[in-house]
Amino acid sequence: YIKFLVYASSAGVFGQKDHYYPFPETHYGAYKLAVEGVARAYFNEAGISSVGIRPYVIYGPGREVGGTAGVTLACKAAKQGNSYTVNFSGKAGFVYVQDVVNLVKMSISQIPSGALTFNINGITTDVSHFINLIKKNIPLASIGIKGNPLSIVDEIRGNEPSNIFKKFKYTSLEDGIKRTIDFY
């Protein structure tokens, strides 16, 4: 039977009101928060421990689908000499995909007790700065931004994975963007 589970929640559990406490303002965020409640119930009723991961904007090799995949697609387009427009603006937390993989591996190897959730904010910056870092690697890149900021606070705080997993660290934007460009 199942003794431990790692699952993907989302920074979408946060709305635009609070950096620390979930207050979803979309059906997607409300659903993800409900799943976290189900995980707590399974721990309380059946002793099944879990780790829920709430990533903000994941970018990197393979992240090519979803509403926030635009920054990865911008890296790919720049490398291939194509123009691209990222479909959201403003500040957000950017998480390199390997950081999420590393957290899953740490969770599986240490199997903490309880129904834990971790906010995976990554590095907070403006989308325009992310684009400038792409252009630092590929000066002739034709990348634009069009769209509104995400419907989540610009930075999620608290419940850091490093509180439990001492070796957990975020990849710098410079390194993550370079690795993403190199992949394509």
What residues fall within each predicted segment?
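Flexible, glycine-rich beta-alpha linker
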Residues: 14-16, 26-27, 51-69
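Active-site Tyr-X1-5-Lys
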Residues: 25-54, 79-80
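Conserved Rossmann-fold NAD(P)-dependent oxidoreductase catalytic core, especially the SDR/UDP-sugar
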Residues: 1-27
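C-terminal substrate-binding subdomain of Rossmann-fold SDR/epimerase-dehydratase oxidoreductases
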Residues: 82, 86-184
